[in-house]
Design a protein with these regions (language model features):
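Cytosol-facing boundaries of transmembrane alpha helices in integral membrane proteins
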Residues: 1-260
């Protein structure tokens, strides 16, 4: 995921979080890359971060710690690009589960097997605030859109389908991208019987000697900038707003698919 922290009109920090995960979705390591944009060509830049093992990844600028526990970079007019690690909880939890011929199996158990496979990505939004609504405490979740992409070898995977997503087949491989909106169902206090907003992605396929290489997941909340809940007066209004979100995710999926070509 990526976010910008603007300190003034000429200086900003872009932060991208990379999560290296195990086959079940559990976190192996979190790497954070920061870019401090030195629009004012300052000689030094102050920066506050919780990262550990911070290192400059694009130059030889160094830093010192000041009395406020801030890093003061000797920028000499340049932008600063650095990287570090962190162990804090992620705002969205990802769980990856597998089935083979309808039976739940582990990642190790499905490896090398053949049959009807299902790969399911479940997302749990953990970032929320508690607010009082009508005398009752409610959880209001920070909205996140999740995009997961897979590149599947057509010698292994065939007859691929996905819920809440798109499939592109170039002959040698199948690119799958799906999206989910965890926490939005709860924010809107909407019954799944009336309207279900996806909080998971499920990929099914016939497999031969199952082997899954890299999967990529992107989390973003920028798509919700135009999502106005005050305009939701009917199911049609909700459908229109969700259609806009879906359109935005489709564009993101199309853009992500281009990266594989």
């Amino acid at each position: 995921s990526s976010e910008s922290d603007k300190t003034d009109t000429k200086t900003a920090k872009d932060e991208t979080v990379y999560v290296l995960a195990n086959a079940d979705g559990s976190v192996k390591k979190i790497i954070v890359s920061d870019w401090i944009k030195n629009g004012l060509n300052e000689k030094s830049l102050k920066d506050k971060t919780d990262l550990q093992d911070v290192k400059n990844v694009k130059g030889d600028e160094s830093y010192v710690m000041d009395t406020d526990n801030m890093r003061v970079w000797n920028a000499d007019g340049a932008d600063i690009y650095y990287q570090g690690t962190i162990s804090k909880e992620l705002p969205v939890d990802l769980k990856v589960s597998y089935k083979l011929d309808g039976k739940t199996v582990s990642a190790d158990e499905i490896a090398g097997k053949s049959g009807k496979a299902t790969i399911r990505f479940d997302y749990t939004n953990k970032q929320y605030s508690e607010v009082n609504i009508g005398g009752k405490t409610e959880k209001i979740y920070v909205p996140f859109a999740m995009l997961t992409g897979l590149m599947l070898d057509n010698d292994v995977f065939s007859n691929v389908s996905v819920t809440n997503g798109k499939i592109i087949n170039d002959g040698d491989r199948t690119i799958v991208a799906g999206f989910a909106l965890p926490g939005l169902q709860e924010n809107l206090n909407l019954s799944k019987d009336k309207f279900e907003i996806p909080d998971y992605i499920e990929v099914t396929a016939d497999v031969k000697n199952f082997a899954l290489t890299t999967t990529l997941t992107l989390a973003t909340n920028s798509l919700f900038n135009e999502f106005d809940t005050s305009k939701l007066n009917s199911a049609d209004d909700l459908q229109a707003q969700l259609n806009e979100l879906t359109s935005g995710m489709t564009k993101l999926i199309d853009g992500s698919s281009e990266l594989y070509n």
